[in-house]
Amino acid sequence: MMKFDNSYAHLPERFSAAVLPTPVKAPRLIAFNRTLAEELLLDVADLDDDRLAAIFSGNVVPQGAEPLAMAYAGHQFGGFVPQLGDGRAILLGEVIDVNGRRRDIQLKGSGPTPFSRRGDGRAALGPVLREYIVSEAMFALGIPATRALAAVLSGDRVQREVGLPGGVFTRVAASHIRVGTFQFFAAREDDEAIRSLADYVIDRHYPDAKNTENPYLALLRGIAERQCALIARWMMVGFIHGVMNTDNMAVSGETIDFGPCAFLDEYHPNKVFSSIDAQGRYAYNNQPGIAQWNIARLAECLLPLLDPEVEKAAELANAVLADFAAAFPQRWLTGMREKLGLTTEEEGDMDLIQSLLSLMQASEADFTLTFRRLSHAANGDAEPFRGMFIDIAGADAFLTRWRERAGREGISDSERSAAMLSINPAIIPRNHRIEELIEAAVEDGDFEPFHAMLTAIATPFEERPDNFVYMQPPMSHERVFRTFCGT
């Protein structure tokens, strides 16, 4: 069924702990991503839903799997925790996909592990459905992210603040190695393990680094560059991760661990949704700086590999961090130019962009809908865009400046509009719609809203009558102000 080709399981014992999933009571398949299964070359065509539920709940361990929980540490909200690890997730193993890429297959909510820290190792149904929707939405938006392979209703109750139905989520990732994985060994001054891990990550994710003068510096630079690109993509769609701890940053460059994540409704640069982020550390506009901070923590782990001389190693690491700080504003500006349909660079572009963002903030304009309507305004239909703002005169002044700026580029209005419509989504996984589908599933056992939203987010740039409801911002009574981690 799965042709496992495991490598992480064969690293030294201190990298992980072998552990079997704990069976659940009555597994029932909620969703299975057959397109992804084909990409992973899984032989599942002849398996019915009951068999799939048994496998992807952990009740049946596939042949060739070497189940394990990974060891890692991490800075959580700025405070270092020397041992975290997979407390409710078990890596079944790795497969080679249709494109020759190595991919992890991991169960989340599959029972306790040696890293559970008194937890039950289980997942409530709500977080399972949230991660399935958001990870697939990110994929459809073209943003690197872990993928959803399966969601299973466990038949067990899990105790949180109240008793809730349990679920098991199957996650597919380029790998599950985190900044915190390096920190786990650095905290123990285990330079041998750090070198082994770095060599493994180079082989798996950054093979070009092997041919450079300083492969470990190239590794650090490669991770920093991917994170810089990733966070810029987040910002372009109003994504707020919510818990950017170092143990939630994947060195592969994929978005991972969706816990209390959310998307902007009305634009506010300091927006926070996560109930556990009381100080706003991981607010929308703070994400680039936090990413750089996390890379600095990774650099600290790699210092012994960068150069034998401490001062020289620090100099090399600081140069990477300086490059991140210089590169991100340019990536952000490039992304915003694209959202405004601008194909060239002019000195006044930043001021033009900031004038729009200021208008949006003052009117509490919806982030996604504003840029979608501006995309239509590029082809002459400006009234819906103007209707987003309290300050109509300000909106008109922006439109005049924007049209003058765009007019200097020599492409047609229809071409510009088409380009903008291809990058400014009509549909994101709206926070209130996610809460609705979770409530329907948890309270009523109704998974139709989940499947309907899953269909809608698969085509985020299409406007159709059947997905119109998913394009709409929340009404005042539908707004979500807080999201929860679910652990």
UniProtKB/Swiss-Prot annotation:
Q: One Pfam match, by short name?
A: SelO
**In which residues is Mg(2+) bound?**
248, 257
Catalytic activities: L-seryl-[protein] + ATP = 3-O-(5'-adenylyl)-L-seryl-[protein] + diphosphate; L-threonyl-[protein] + ATP = 3-O-(5'-adenylyl)-L-threonyl-[protein] + diphosphate; L-tyrosyl-[protein] + ATP = O-(5'-adenylyl)-L-tyrosyl-[protein] + diphosphate; L-histidyl-[protein] + UTP = N(tele)-(5'-uridylyl)-L-histidyl-[protein] + diphosphate
The role this protein plays is: Nucleotidyltransferase involved in the post-translational modification of proteins. It can catalyze the addition of adenosine monophosphate (AMP) or uridine monophosphate (UMP) to a protein, resulting in modifications known as AMPylation and UMPylation.
Q: Which organism is it from?
A: Agrobacterium fabrum (strain C58 / ATCC 33970)
Residues at which ATP binds:
85, 87-88, 108, 120-121, 171, 178, 257
The record's EC number reads 2.7.7.-, 2.7.7.108
Protein name, please?
Answer: Protein nucleotidyltransferase YdiU
Keyword field contains Lyase: no
Q: Which UniProt keywords apply?
A: ATP-binding, Magnesium, Manganese, Metal-binding, Nucleotide-binding, Nucleotidyltransferase, Transferase
Catalytic residues in the record = 247
InterPro entries in UniProt: SelO (IPR003846)
The similarity comment for this entry is:
Belongs to the SELO family.
* Top-tier EC class: transferase
